Amino acid sequence: MLRRLLLVMAMMAGSLALFATLAPAAQAAEPLRMASLAPVAPVMPCADLAKLDLAGATGAPTTFTATEVAGAKPYCQVSGTIARANRFEVRLPLGGWTQRFLQTGCGGLCGSLRIDPGKAEGCTPVTDGSIVLASTDMGHSGNGSEWGENADQRTDFAYRGVHVTTLAAKALIKAFYGQAQRYAYFSGCSDGGREALMEAQRYPQDFDGIAAGAPALNFTVQNSFHHGWLAKQNTGADGKPVLTWPDMVPLHAAVLKSCDGLDGLVDGQITDPRLCRFDPAVILCKAAYEAGKCLTATQVAVVRKIYDGARSAKGTKLEIGAEMPGSEMEWRSGFVPSTRDGRIGSEMFMTSTVNALMFTPNPKTPYSSATMPFTEAFYAAGEPARKLYSADDADISRFLAHGKLLLWHGWADPHISPMNSIDYYARVGLKAGTAQRDAAMRLFLFPGMGHCSGGDGPSEFPLLANLMAWVESGKAPGRMVAARAGQTAEGLPVGIRGAGPNGPGAGGPPLAGPGGPGGPAGPGGVQAARQGPPPGMMPPKEVLPPRSRPIFAYPQVARYSGKGSVDDAASFVAATPAPTKDVAVWIGASR
């Protein structure tokens, strides 16, 4: 019951070198204030929108239909295709439009239409249906990568699909309401986060406010070296996984025992995993291996390589960041299957990109994690693809001159290391200058959060409300309060533990698409790539208590004030850590 003990203990460790200064006691946050905009009614019937010619706006032949959708929040639904094959959808309120437009990104390799304004707590324009919504499938159907042979579809996925959908949506807004939107927003996570940054970099005038969550900004590296390394390390000589789900229980408990208290509080989550110096040898089996109790010498070696990240034989770091200490319970969603007969999702993530999207022409002999070269030369060979897909250009001065950017990431993200976001934030400061960056950009890091949501830590927060309030009232968010409802110890909501061999997931890994391998409802009826333990292999059925925690704008962190419940945000104050070197040293650092 170590996990339960760790979660209920709360202690102060005195003055830690981690913190340079402490802010005064936290006070109630000011209410978020958005602009008061007069509701606007349509100036034409919904059906008449279908008579418009959008080719002039999108720059390509565009076909679409327009249909009224009844309900508590009725809207005009426009569904269409922008040549070559960008399917898009726009929802325009039939009454009470408050002059705002929100476009949402897609996850994985996209391939389906799903408007998902997530993290909308407290965002009235979204919750009351008074905002125009739009999204695109990024130019192809299905979450596979078979379309990768087509150069136009590669470009659509890389950046064009989002942009032309934006152009179409804005043209529809102007025609339907007789005026343009007052504010335009974009929000996405995972690949949607990459899409968000791509908009800021390539089309800085498209949006006034952008929220980029866990962005797959180093797309080619992420889906070649990162996932390839994870798959290779966790595949034994017999072709079976070295680590399986039961091994995560003692590993994660040992990490928490070693590093949970570094911030002065033992609360079941690690505030800054960069400070954790953990050696998995502390749980090396002293006798025979027993699943769920200890690790073999081989498993210890694999865990060390997983924490270290992809390297060449010369020792060159081939990626910005690897798995962070404290993320172990999230590894099931990519490269640690439930049993030794399970598949390693990271293998599929890697092969989908390397064999279908990275090279022209595609490799004659497909790569696997066992045959893909982890070399400097292979990184160089992927440069053309990096320039196409990756949203790693830190020169976003044109966007920052008028817009606002919220960058956010979970510290326990197993698919995209939060070190990518930290590095990008630092490089924007070098390019634009810290004054311009700090006036228009914020980074928020969430302890214990997995990929886009979930995990041990609080992961639901008013993202869109904060973004809109910043853009419309000019008040930058200094903190956001994140919440965690009651959930099981592996980060799943209460009531769905044991739902099947493929546990429910949110956000989806970078190459799994909305439904993971197997489509919108994968083999387990949910996201197949986000594997959870099957019945009979669960950790003890403990329930983590509801928790709220302030998340302060980077580099500040939350520190327990010494009074009140550790599950109450009011018990925490802002602390400024000692400075860290945030620009990563790796093979791509010179770009």
Model-assigned labels for residue ranges:
Residues 8-21:
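Bacterial N-terminal signal peptides
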Residues 28-100, 104, 112-121, 252, ...:
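Catalytic-loop region of hydrolases
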Residues 107-178, 224-225, 232, 366-388, ...:
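Cap/lid segment of the alpha/beta-hydrolase catalytic domain
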Residues 179-190:
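Alpha/beta-hydrolase fold nucleophile elbow
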Residues 189-198:
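Glycine-rich nucleophile elbow surrounding the catalytic serine of serine-hydrolase chemistry
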Residues 198-200, 205-311, 445, 459, ...:
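A catalytic-pocket lid/entrance helix-loop region that shapes and gates access to the active site
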Residues 407-409:
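Short beta-strand/loop motif that positions the catalytic acidic residue
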Residues 440-454, 487-488:
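Histidine-bearing beta->alpha loop at or near hydrolase active sites
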